[in-house]
């Protein structure tokens, strides 16, 4: 009977040990395992979210870079257009200024020509009167002289 009683005592001790483990040891171990699983799952979710966020951020950065390049290209194109426009305006202004200077020079030449013609008329009239005086051997008074010069100038 010793064997039976020992076996029953061991079975009872084992049952108490199992009950004790199930009641006091097993729940904290299971809770720790569940918490660890939850932390691992949360970590994996966070890593997945971080990967998605990183991909999204990279896409946004690429899009912004593309937009910035397009804007820079537009600004450069506008600058080239404006520079060409300024060059054309400068050419037009220079051409107009040159034409204006040519017209001014032509006007001055015309005035000088008229002045020279008038002076030449006066000199020709004076020479004609001097020649006539010498031919006639007579002197004409100043008033008569002016009248003849004006008359000759009008005829010429």
UniProtKB/Swiss-Prot annotation:
It comes from the Bacteria. Keywords: ATP synthesis, Cell inner membrane, Cell membrane, CF(0), Hydrogen ion transport, Ion transport, Membrane, Transmembrane, Transmembrane helix, Transport. The keyword Lyase does not apply. One of its GO terms (molecular function) is proton-transporting ATPase activity, rotational mechanism. GO terms for cellular component: plasma membrane; proton-transporting ATP synthase complex. The chain crosses the membrane at residues 5-25. Pfam families: ATP-synt_B. CDD domains: ATP-synt_Fo_b. Belongs to the ATPase B chain family. F-type ATPases have 2 components, F(1) - the catalytic core - and F(0) - the membrane proton channel. F(1) has five subunits: alpha(3), beta(3), gamma(1), delta(1), epsilon(1). F(0) has three main subunits: a(1), b(2) and c(10-14). The alpha and beta chains form an alternating ring which encloses part of the gamma chain. F(1) is attached to F(0) by a central stalk formed by the gamma and epsilon chains, while a peripheral stalk is formed by the delta and b chains. This is ATP synthase subunit b.
């Amino acid at each position: 009977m010793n064997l039976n009683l020992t076996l029953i005592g061991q079975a009872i001790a084992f049952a108490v040990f199992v009950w004790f483990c199930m009641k006091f040891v097993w729940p904290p171990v299971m809770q720790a395992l569940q918490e660890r699983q939850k932390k691992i799952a949360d970590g994996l979710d966070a890593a997945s979210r971080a990967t998605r966020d990183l991909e999204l951020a990279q896409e946004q950065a690429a899009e912004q870079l593309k937009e910035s390049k397009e804007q820079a290209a537009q600004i450069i194109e506008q600058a080239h257009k404006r520079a060409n426009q300024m060059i054309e305006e400068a050419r037009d202004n220079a051409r107009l200024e040159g034409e204006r200077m040519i017209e001014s020079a032509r006007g001055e030449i015309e005035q000088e020509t008229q002045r020279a013609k008038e002076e030449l008329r006066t000199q020709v009239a004076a020479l004609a009167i001097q020649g006539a005086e010498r031919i006639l051997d007579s002197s004409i008074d100043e008033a008569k002289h002016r009248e003849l010069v004006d008359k000759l100038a009008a005829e010429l």
